[in-house]
Amino acid sequence: MLKKLSLAILSLALVPALSMATDAGTLQKGEKLYKSSCIACHSTGAANAPKLGNKQAWEPLIARGMDQMMDVATKGKGAMPARGGTKADDESLRAAVEYMVSRVQ
């Protein structure tokens, strides 16, 4: 019984990570947008932006899920303007978020 319960809990813990899994093409698209726009703040931590590769900064955001991260990316937060100040479509914006998340997993 305990073994089944542990397996069920582990499965639930993996759901957010699995929902963010992407293919190489999406990650390349995300990296391109990151390098053209997001890098300014997410490479330095300017205005409290979570730095690329900083697992500790990204973990609470990842725990909230992709929908929450996309809401922030789309609408902006703090000094970050909506869509990171770009005209990126939802697919490209999501690819950039997924790229940044992939750098800490």
Language-model-detected regions and their locations in the chain:
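N-terminal export/targeting leaders of redox proteins
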Residues: 1-28, 104-105
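Gly/Gly-Pro-rich "capping" loops immediately C-terminal to redox-active cysteine motifs
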Residues: 43-71
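The canonical Cys-X-X-Cys-His
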Residues: 35-44, 96, 100
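Axial heme c-ligation environment in periplasmic c-type cytochrome domains
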Residues: 50-51, 69-103
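ATP/adenylate-binding site constellation spanning eukaryotic-like Ser/Thr protein kinases
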Residues: 11, 35, 66
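Local sequence-structure signature of Cys/Sec-based thiol-disulfide redox active-site neighborhoods
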Residues: 28-36
